């Protein structure tokens, strides 16, 4: 089942457990992680990011991640990790991510804060959590 990352992170904090987060590079990793999460009956965050784009076309892989999350017996979040631009995280959202991470750490501090505000102003009203 596709899950809201904010809800599960709060629930974990309030109940003394962590929600595991795995960067996924290919279908075999994705299936192994989802099988393990279901066996453990644990919510899970599966992510894909800019570092992995050369390995797989995101639009195609995002569909597989989203489909597996939606059909999972446990809560699963699809997170785009370390997006280097607004356009990258927006594209990930359009193709199935239900959480995004905008990495503006290479910008000067004030620009980083401004960019983070721009991203959160766009995504939060759409119910999409932002890690920054």
Language-model segment annotations:
Residues 40-42, 94-100:
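Glycine-enriched alpha-helix->loop->beta-strand junction motifs that scaffold or abut catalytic
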Residues 28-31, 54-62, 84-91, 104-131:
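Active-site-adjacent beta->alpha loops and helix N-cap segments on the catalytic face
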Residues 5-6, 27-72:
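Glycine-rich, positively charged N-terminal anion/phosphate-binding segment
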Residues 72-75, 95-97:
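Structural recognition of alpha->loop->beta junctions
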Residues 18-23, 44-48, 76-82, 100-102, ...:
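Hydrophobic faces of well-ordered beta-strands that scaffold small-molecule active sites
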Residues 1-20:
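N-terminal amphipathic alpha-helix/helix-capping segment at the start of soluble metabolic enzymes
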Residues 80-85, 95:
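Long, hydrophobic/aromatic-enriched structural stretches that serve as scaffold segments
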